[in-house]
């Protein structure tokens, strides 16, 4: 896709089908970034395309094809993205809802399981019996590797996810240790049914499976005083910087909540 954007840009801006690397300078980069931003790319998407182009220059320098890097004087940075999450009130609304349709109940249960464990979709889908292990505290933990990064993950199971595992322990899929423990549908179907669940529960946020992971990081752990380093390990983040995004979201909410409180108490005088 990056190549397609670049090819169209060259045609529209320069009436050419190609450019040699030595011809590309900071003026070219500035025009290309502006083109991306004015053709449907937000800041971070445009930045990722620019970073892809930068990789070409880095490799060309390593191979001795060019000696200068136009990106050395061109600043490109991703902007932090706020992660959506459910409040405890919203989560409890979903947990307490009774559904007449069994498939919605299954999807809700698996979503809630992820809210209380932080498991990503692929990790919840492949979770097996041998990955539930009793640890030093006498409680069962999830001991696995993140499918996305291969990072070791150890997550203590709270009462809610334990109850969900108990509920589905007699399903056909979980009857053998090599089979998944939970009846997880395709990601596309899960998200489609979650949207339906959100509508039925009056949740105005875009309910997707990944929102559960964000909810674990914010509402379940950080908001309740779990240290960021611990949360980072349970999420399987490779750097603490990734986890800090969630902390920033919580700090921003605290600031807004206190500003609202200050406004309400503004008339009280000493």
Please identify what each model-predicted range represents.
Residues 5-12, 19, 38-72, 122:
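N-terminal DNA-binding recognition helix of tyrosine site-specific recombinases/integrases
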């Amino acid at each position: 896709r990056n190549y397609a954007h670049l090819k169209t840009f060259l045609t529209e801006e320069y009436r050419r089908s190609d450019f040699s690397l030595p011809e590309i300078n900071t003026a070219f980069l500035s025009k290309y970034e502006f083109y991306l931003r004015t053709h449907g790319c937000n800041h971070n998407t445009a930045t990722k395309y620019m970073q892809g182009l930068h990789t070409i220059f880095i490799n060309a320098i390593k191979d001795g094809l060019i000696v200068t890097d136009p990106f050395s004087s061109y600043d490109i940075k991703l902007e932090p993205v706020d992660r959506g999450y459910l409040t405890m009130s919203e989560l409890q609304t979903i947990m307490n809802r009774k559904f007449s349709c069994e498939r919605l109940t299954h999807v809700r249960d698996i979503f809630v399981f992820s809210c209380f464990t932080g498991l990503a979709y692929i990790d919840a889908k492949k979770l097996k019996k041998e990955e539930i292990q009793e640890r030093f505290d006498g409680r069962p933990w999830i001991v696995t590797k993140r499918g996305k990064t291969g990072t070791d993950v150890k997550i203590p199971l709270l009462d809610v996810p334990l109850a969900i595992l108990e509920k589905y322990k007699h399903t056909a899929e979980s009857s053998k240790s090599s089979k998944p423990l939970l009846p997880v549908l395709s990601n596309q179907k899960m998200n489609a049914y979650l949207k339906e669940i959100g509508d039925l529960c009056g949740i105005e946020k875009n309910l997707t499976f990944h929102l559960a992971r964000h909810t674990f990081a914010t509402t379940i752990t950080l908001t309740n005083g779990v240290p960021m380093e611990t949360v980072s390990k349970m999420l399987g983040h490779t750097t603490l910087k990734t986890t800090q995004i969630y902390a920033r979201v919580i700090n921003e909410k605290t600031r807004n909540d206190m500003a609202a409180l200050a406004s309400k108490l503004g008339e009280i005088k000493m």
